[in-house]
Amino acid sequence: MINSSIITYYQFLLMSISLISMLTGEVFPVTDIMINGDQDSRVNIVFLGDGYTQEEMNDYIDDVGEVVEGLFSAVPYSNYINYFNVFAIEVPSNESGTDHPGTANDCGGDAGNVFYADTYFNSTFDYYGIHRLLVPLNTSAAYDVLIDNTPQWDIVFLMVNTTIYGGSGGAFATFSRNAASTEIAVHELGHSFAGLADEYWYSGWETANMTQESNPLLNKWNPWLYDNDIG
């Protein structure tokens, strides 16, 4: 028989941990961009912004709205829009922009355009020696913000306040507010959410959108063959 005092102790411990989390966690405003149902029955997309100051929060919400409109105009997301919720957490940075240390060998015309900004998630270009690879270095801060503000997230977009082209996949689909931001978001979401490989080969392993099967009738995407030019 389990000692009731042990149960009481663990209940107290859990309550204490929960209270400490509430006291130490930082709560930010969360804007509902698109709501189609309860969070426990929808795919919940959460946007984080990096390099947006408090004075630029309205710009951030406008930028998110443009990306969401473009995202759900694209197939297959347009077909399943009612299955998604979208939220934007308003996390201000101390300075506007991001980092470009100029350390990549493929910076091209941006080679001499070196700059730094004090941002909440410490995003930077030139990651792993690739100029366009834009990543948040402070991922622990991103997880803390998500846990404290939108704990039921499924997909995370991190939008960086710069017009220079860049992005990355991984746990956070990251992209800049470049003119091609919607296309970058759709592309990186394929990596982060669907686990898809790039449309070009460089290395790696077989993924959901890759196959060695030469017979199209046996391909994994056979049910969608020739639908919207899928081949």
Model-identified regions with their sequence ranges:
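Short, solvent-exposed loop/turn and secondary-structure capping segments
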Residues: 58-59, 98-101, 168-171, 194-196, ...
